[in-house]
C-alpha cells in the first residue's frame, strides 16, 4: 500500500510541475510586461518618444493583449507624426478595449492628422452621443473645426468647454491660439494669462505664452516667458528653438547664432537652426560666414527650400559672376530641371532652368532651356536664346544651324511682315512692389514672409506684363511699405505672410493700391510636400497675374488694322475684343484691382484677328463719329471677375494644437 501511495504522489508531482512552471513563466512575463509599460509611460512623460516606443514594443512582445500598452504605442507614433502606424495600433487597442473612450478619442486625433475628416466627425458624434461632456472629445471636436477651416466655430466650442472646465490648461491654450489666429491678440493674451495664473509651474504654458506674445510683437515679454519655460525644463527643444527666434527678432543676432549652435550640437538635422544661424550672420554683415553655414546646411538636407533660397540670394548679392560656387548651385537646378523634363512637367522644369540661369546666366544649359521654350510653342523666344548663346561665343555647329533654320522659318511671321523687332517693342505695363513686414515670422522659419516674397518677386520677373520693383523686401510697418511703393510709382504693392508646419505651407498675399494704400485683393495658396514653397509662390503669382487687366500698346496703324505689342506669350487670344483708350488717360481704381476711364476716353475697339508669339494684329472700330485712334493709345481688356481663392486651414495653428499635450 505505501508503495502505491508513493507512486501516486510521484505521478501527481510530475503532472503538476509543467502546469506550475507555465503559470510561473506566464506570471513573470506579465510582470515584465507591466514593468516595460510603466517604463514607457515615464518615458512618455519626459517626451522621449523613441525610448517609449521601444518599451511598449517589448511590453507587447511579452503580452500581446496589453490594451493600455497598445494604446500608448499608438500615441507615441502619433507624437512622432507616423500617423498611418498610429492608426494601425490604435485600432488594435480598440479591439482590446472597446468601451475605452480615451482610445476612441486618440483615433479621432489620428484621423484628423491623416485628413480623414468625415471619419473623424462620425466618431466624434458617436462619442458625444454617449458622453456629451467628454473633455477630450470636445477638444478633438475643436481641432476638427480647425482642420475644416472653421476657426470661429472652434472658438465657440472651446469657449463653451472652458466654461465647464475653467482650469483646463489645454483648453485655455487652445482658445488663446484660435483667438489669436482670428486676429484678436488682446483676447488671446487674456486667455493665456489665465492659463499662466492657474498653472504657474507648467513649462508648456510658458512656451505657448512666449509664442502668443511674440505673434503680438511683444518680443521682450515673449523672451521672458521662453526663459521661464527653459527654467522649468532646460532641455525642452521647442522653447530653445523659440528663444533663438526671439533673440533674432529682438536684434540679438550674436546670441541667436550661439543658441543655434547649441541646437545643432544636439540635433544636426534641425534645419530651422541652420537656417536661423545663416540669417543671423547675414544680419551681422558676415555674408561669407553665412554662405559657409548655409552651404553646410544644404549638404545636410539639399531639399530645404528656405535655406537654398537664402543661400542663393546671399551668393547673388555678395559674390561675382565668376564665383565657382554660383555654377555649382546652378547645376543643382539644372539637374532638377532635367528630371522634371523627363516626366513632362514643363512648368516645373522651366522654373528650375530659370533659377539656375539666374545663378549662372552664361551656362551652356541655356541651350536646354531654349529647347524647352521651343517645345512649349515659342519658336521666336527659342531663337532669341540661341542668338544669346552665339553672342557669348559658346555656340556650336548645331546651334548655328538651328539659328539659320528658325530664322528662315520665321521669315513670314507677323513681326517680319510689319517690319518690327518684338524684343525692342516688349513693354511691361504693371509696376508691382512685393514686401513682407519685418515682424512676420512663421513657427518654423524667421522672416518666412520675406523669403517667400523674394521667390514671388523672382517669379514675377518672368511675367511679361509685370515689372517687379527692386526694393527692400523687409518693411518695418505698413506705412513704410505704402510710402515706398507710392513714391516709386508702383501700381500695386503686395504684403506677403506665411504660416507653416513641418509638412505644409500657406502663403497669404494682400494687395494694396499704390496711390491710395486701399485694399485691392487677397490671394491665398496652400501646398504640401516637396517644393511647397515654390509651388505655393507660383500659385500666388498665377492668381495675381490673372486678376490684373491685360494692357498693351497700339504700335502701328494701317487703315482699319493695328499692331499691338502683346501676343500669345502674354495671353492674347484671337477674336477677343479690347478697349482702345486714349494715351495717358486711364488710371487704377482707388480700391480693388481695376482700370477706370470715362466713355469719352474710350476711342475705339480692337478685335484680334491674328496672334503671333509676341505681337498681334486686329481690326479697329472707332467709338463715336470721329476717328480718334492713334499709335501710342492703350489697349485694355478688363480681367474677368473670378471667385477668389479661399483661405485654407492654418497649418501652423493645426501643428500647435496637435502637439499640445
Region annotations inferred by a language model:
Residues 33-34, 67-68, 101-102, 135-136, ...:
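Helix-start (N-cap) detector for alpha-helical repeat units in TPR-like alpha-solenoids
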Residues 30, 64, 98, 132, ...:
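Short coil turns that delineate tetratricopeptide repeat
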Residues 38, 72, 106, 140, ...:
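Canonical tetratricopeptide repeat
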Residues 193, 197, 224-227, 231, ...:
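Surface-exposed, polar/charged interaction patches used for macromolecular assembly or partner binding
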Residues 31-62, 79, 113, 140-147, ...:
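Alpha-helical segment of the N-proximal tetratricopeptide repeat
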Residues 45-46, 79-80, 113-114, 147-148, ...:
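Register position in tetratricopeptide repeats
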Amino acid at each position: 500500500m505505501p508503495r502505491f501511495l508513493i507512486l501516486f504522489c510521484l505521478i501527481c508531482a510530475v503532472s503538476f510541475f509543467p502546469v506550475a512552471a507555465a503559470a510561473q513563466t506566464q506570471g513573470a512575463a506579465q510582470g515584465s510586461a507591466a514593468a516595460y509599460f510603466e517604463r514607457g509611460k515615464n518615458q512618455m512623460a519626459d517626451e522621449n518618444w523613441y525610448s517609449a516606443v521601444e518599451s511598449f514594443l517589448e511590453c507587447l512582445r511579452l503580452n500581446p493583449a496589453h490594451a493600455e500598452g497598445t494604446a500608448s504605442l499608438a500615441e507615441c507614433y502619433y507624437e512622432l507624426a507616423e500617423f498611418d502606424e498610429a492608426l494601425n495600433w490604435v485600432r488594435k487597442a480598440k479591439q482590446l478595449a472597446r468601451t475605452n473612450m480615451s482610445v476612441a478619442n486618440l483615433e479621432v486625433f489620428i484621423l484628423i492628422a491623416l485628413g480623414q475628416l468625415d471619419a473623424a466627425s462620425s466618431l466624434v458624434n458617436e462619442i458625444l452621443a454617449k458622453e456629451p461632456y467628454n473633455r477630450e472629445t470636445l477638444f478633438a471636436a475643436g481641432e476638427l473645426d480647425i482642420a475644416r477651416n472653421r476657426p470661429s466655430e472652434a472658438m465657440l466650442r472651446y469657449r463653451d468647454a472652458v466654461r465647464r472646465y475653467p482650469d483646463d490648461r489645454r483648453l485655455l491654450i487652445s482658445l488663446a491660439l484660435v483667438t489669436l489666429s482670428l486676429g484678436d491678440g488682446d483676447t488671446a493674451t487674456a486667455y493665456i494669462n489665465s492659463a499662466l495664473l492657474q498653472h504657474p509651474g507648467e513649462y508648456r504654458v510658458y512656451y505657448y505664452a512666449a509664442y502668443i506674445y511674440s505673434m503680438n510683437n511683444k518680443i521682450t515679454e515673449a523672451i521672458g516667458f521662453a526663459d521661464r519655460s527653459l527654467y522649468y525644463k532646460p532641455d525642452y527643444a521647442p522653447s530653445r528653438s523659440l528663444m533663438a527666434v526671439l533673440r533674432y527678432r529682438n536684434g540679438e543676432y550674436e546670441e541667436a547664432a550661439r543658441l543655434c549652435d547649441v541646437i545643432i550640437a544636439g540635433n544636426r538635422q534641425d534645419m530651422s537652426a541652420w537656417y536661423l544661424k545663416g540669417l543671423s550672420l547675414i544680419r551681422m554683415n558676415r555674408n561669407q560666414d553665412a554662405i559657409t553655414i548655409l552651404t553646410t546646411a544644404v549638404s545636410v538636407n539639399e531639399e530645404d527650400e528656405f535655406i537654398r533660397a537664402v543661400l542663393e540670394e546671399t551668393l547673388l548679392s555678395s559674390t561675382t559672376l565668376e564665383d565657382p560656387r554660383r555654377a555649382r548651385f546652378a547645376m543643382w537646378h539644372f539637374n532638377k530641371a532635367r528630371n522634371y523634363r523627363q516626366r513632362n512637367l514643363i512648368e516645373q522644369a522651366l522654373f528650375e532652368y530659370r533659377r539656375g540661369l539666374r545663378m549662372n546666366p552664361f551656362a551652356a544649359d541655356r541651350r536646354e532651356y531654349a529647347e524647352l521654350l521651343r517645345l512649349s510653342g515659342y519658336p521666336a523666344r527659342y531663337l532669341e536664346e540661341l542668338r544669346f548663346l552665339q553672342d557669348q561665343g559658346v555656340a556650336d555647329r548645331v546651334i548655328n544651324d538651328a539659328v539659320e533654320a528658325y530664322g528662315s522659318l520665321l521669315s513670314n511671321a507677323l513681326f517680319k511682315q510689319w517690319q518690327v523687332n518684338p524684343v525692342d517693342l516688349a513693354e511691361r505695363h504693371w509696376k508691382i512692389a512685393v514686401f513682407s513686414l519685418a515682424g512676420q515670422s512663421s513657427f518654423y522659419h524667421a522672416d518666412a514672409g520675406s523669403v517667400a516674397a523674394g521667390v514671388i518677386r523672382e517669379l514675377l520677373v518672368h511675367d511679361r506684363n509685370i515689372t517687379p520693383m527692386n526694393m527692400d523686401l523687409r518693411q518695418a510697418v505698413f506705412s513704410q511699405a505704402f510710402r515706398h511703393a507710392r513714391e516709386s510709382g508702383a501700381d500695386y504693392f503686395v504684403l506677403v505672410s506665411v504660416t507653416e508646419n513641418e509638412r505644409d505651407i500657406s502663403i497669404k498675399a494682400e494687395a494694396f493700391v499704390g496711390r491710395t494704400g486701399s485694399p485691392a485683393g487677397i490671394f491665398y495658396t496652400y501646398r504640401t510636400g516637396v517644393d511647397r514653397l515654390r509651388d505655393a509662390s507660383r500659385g500666388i503669382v498665377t492668381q495675381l497675374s490673372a486678376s490684373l487687366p491685360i494692357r498693351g500698346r497700339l504700335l502701328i496703324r494701317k487703315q482699319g488694322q493695328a499692331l499691338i505689342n502683346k501676343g500669345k506669350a502674354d495671353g492674347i487670344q484671337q477674336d477677343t475684343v479690347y478697349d482702345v483708350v486714349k494715351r495717358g488717360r486711364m488710371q487704377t481704381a482707388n480700391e480693388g484691382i481695376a482700370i477706370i476711364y470715362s466713355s469719352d476716353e474710350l476711342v475705339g475697339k480692337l478685335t484680334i484677328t491674328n496672334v503671333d508669339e509676341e505681337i498681334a494684329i486686329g481690326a479697329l472700330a472707332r467709338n463715336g463719329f470721329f476717328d480718334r485712334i492713334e499709335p501710342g493709345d492703350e489697349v485694355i481688356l478688363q480681367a474677368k471677375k473670378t471667385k477668389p481663392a479661399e483661405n485654407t486651414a492654418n497649418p501652423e495653428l493645426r501643428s500647435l494644437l496637435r502637439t499640445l499635450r
